[in-house]
Regions:
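An active-site-proximal "capping" alpha-helix that borders the catalytic cofactor pocket
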Residues: 100-104, 185, 189, 252-273
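Post-HExxH zinc-binding segment in Zn-dependent metallohydrolases
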Residues: 171, 178-213, 264-267
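Juxtamembrane "helix exit" motif at the C-terminal ends of alpha-helical transmembrane segments
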Residues: 28-49, 185-194, 548
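Hydrophobic alpha-helical transmembrane segments
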Residues: 37-62, 221-234
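Peri-catalytic and regulatory segments of divalent metal-dependent proteins
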Residues: 73-181, 185
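Transmembrane alpha-helices and immediately adjacent membrane-cytoplasm interface residues
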Residues: 50-80
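Select subsegments of transmembrane alpha-helices in polytopic membrane proteins
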Residues: 17-31
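Cytosolic-facing loops and C-terminal tails of multi-pass membrane proteins
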Residues: 2-5, 205-246, 250, 258, ...
Length: 549
């Protein structure tokens, strides 16, 4: 199918969506007008006043008021804020030159502002008027992970895709459909919110009434708070209409995604566009994993990476050979999702297939380099540090900043202290010092059951006696002794956790120590405890170099 025919189909659907949007407001107006007509007709045709009129008036008011208030009178909060770090033309001439070139190649007006954001995202937004029909100031946001994780060619493709949305002839009507989705969704959400408030208010009234009844020895009422009244029914009614509107409007959005992909392939090249589409889901997963497992690992201990590394450290993760291989596999093994009629984006797998089916195209000259996209940003570490200041919570300013090796060690040491708390409490409650030597002394003195009974354990273990109790207690005591031993070694700087971008952090021990430690722990918690191997090992590790025998 030609681009012209595709554009005509999209324009037709956009016009249908605009018609449906108008129909939404006409439907609301028809409800109000119909109620007014019904009441007027009743008054005109009745020869006398009767109580049914009052009931109808009250019912009509109960229906018309929320429709008028929510659909026509409630103003949605306008979001005039633009989050992120401004990247000015003077500070970032290379990035601006690239953006201007791509916008020009797409045939659209470039942005008045570029902002750096923390998310795996890019987008062009416009301050429009009249539901998007009148253009305004244009903004571009670029996610820091895109600069860190994509090549220049892949970033060119992403930016060309975003500008491509504005190159379509029906972009203004599509703006109307987006505004329509927002307006209809806001109406339904407001009706549900008002219904929820009615339920909460009624529940509070019933609770107060029941408290009054109980204070006077009367039976509490079994009345429930209802479902939210007329607002809930109106929300359900408008939801039926919204489903039709969303189905049509999201179909428009999916068509525009394909059209924007074609713009990207023409400007940045077919292969770069397909590569970017494959890489984005993997990059999003990598960002989430990195933030959870690395950037925020020390937050509980009041620790953060050095300035610029909270977001910038993602590049270290992506540079690890094993992680890079994992991400490459994710890009090749895209999920075979079924299209959702209510989703604004087609499945990535289908978009990639469409792009890869296009004729080979290298893109425009001067674009499509395979250098890291972060090279387009001047002084990237400083910019990423400034982004942290904007994105992180205020309390982050009070946290201690460490380089990655120290951050990993100090974080794991804090976890080791936390893990050792149960056995430290057990020793203290038994009148002993909270040290590994004190626990070894207790084991030698035959107090293993006393210590074990004070450790957290299952109900079955707590009730066990005799041989069964010893079998339950042995792994408890071994874990407790291992926690104390690890804490002692790390606290005395005899062992250190090592950073790995490909694996979880591990306590660095010599081959000899790694072989002897498990055996020594097993011996110490055996039925006939032998603490000598562990005492000897700890003494050797603590002895200065050259003193060990």
């Amino acid at each position: 199918m030609s681009t012209e025919r595709t554009g005509m189909r999209t324009s037709t659907r956009a016009l249908l969506a605009v018609t449906l949007l108008a129909g939404f407001y006409l439907l609301a107006a028809a409800i109000v007008v119909g109620l007014i007509w019904l009441n007027v007709e009743l008054v005109v045709t009745s020869d006398r006043f009767h109580s049914a009129m009052v009931k109808l008036w009250l019912l009509s008011a109960a229906i018309a008021y929320p429709v008028l208030r929510v659909v026509f009178l409630t103003r949605r909060k306008r979001d005039d804020s633009h989050d992120g770090l401004p990247l000015t033309r003077e500070e970032q001439p290379e990035l601006w030159a690239r953006v201007d070139r791509i916008a020009e190649a797409t045939g659209v007006r470039g942005p008045a502002e570029i902002r750096l954001v923390p998310q795996v995202n890019a987008g062009v937004y416009e301050e429009t008027k009249l539901l998007g029909l009148i253009p305004g100031r244009r903004h571009l946001i670029i996610g820091a992970p895109l600069l860190i994780g994509l090549t220049e060619a892949e970033l060119d493709s992403v930016l060309a895709h975003e500008f491509g949305h504005y190159a379509n002839n029906d972009v203004r009507l599509s703006g109307v459909t987006v505004a329509g989705r927002t307006a209809i969704g806001h109406t339904i959400a407001t009706l549900h919110r008002r219904a929820d408030q009615h339920v909460a208010d009624r529940a509070a009234e019933i609770a107060d009434d029941n408290a009054y009844r109980k204070a006077r020895g009367r039976k509490a009422s079994d009345e429930d708070a209802g479902n939210g009244g007329i607002e809930r029914y109106l929300a359900k009614f408008f939801t039926l209409y919204a489903k039709l509107y969303f189905r049509v409007s999201e179909s428009i959005s999916r068509s525009q995604e394909y059209a924007a992909d074609r713009h990207a392939a023409r400007i940045a090249g077919r292969d770069a566009t397909a590569s970017a589409l494959r890489r984005l889901p993997a990059l999003d997963a990598a960002q989430s994993f990195y933030l959870d497992s690395y950037a925020t690992m020390g937050v509980g201990a009041g620790l953060l990476p050095l300035p610029g590394q909270f977001f910038g450290g993602l590049g270290r993760l992506l540079a690890d050979p094993e992680r890079r291989e994992e991400l490459a596999e994710m890009g090749l093994d895209l999920p075979d999702e079924q299209p959702d009629p209510y989703d604004s984006h087609p499945p990535i797998r289908r978009r990639v297939a469409v792009i890869e089916a296009l004729p080979d195209s290298p893109g425009l000259p001067g674009l499509g380099e395979n250098r890291p996209a972060l090279g387009l940003l001047r002084d990237p570490q400083q910019r990423l540090a400034e982004l942290e200041t904007l994105a992180l919570r205020p309390e982050a300013a009070q946290m201690r900043r460490l380089d990655w090796p120290d951050l990993v060690h100090e974080t794991m040491l804090a976890h080791a202290r936390e893990n050792a708390q149960p056995v430290l409490r057990a020793l203290t409650d038994s009148g002993l010092h909270g040290t590994v030597e004190a626990m070894l002394d207790a084991l030698d003195a035959g107090r293993s059951e006393e210590i074990a009974r004070r450790l957290p354990q299952s109900e079955e273990a707590a009730q066990a006696t005799g041989r069964a109790a010893r079998e339950f207690h042995r792994p408890l005591l071994r874990r407790a002794l291992q926690s104390l031993t690890v804490l002692a070694l790390a606290s005395q700087q005899l062992a250190r956790w090592e950073l790995s971008w490909g694996h979880p952090a591990a306590l660095a021990l010599s081959d000899d120590t790694a072989e002897r430690l498990p055996v020594a722990l097993d011996a110490a918690v055996a039925d006939a405890p032998d603490t000598a191997p562990l005492r000897t090992l700890l003494a050797e590790l603590a002895a200065p170099a050259g003193v060990q025998s």
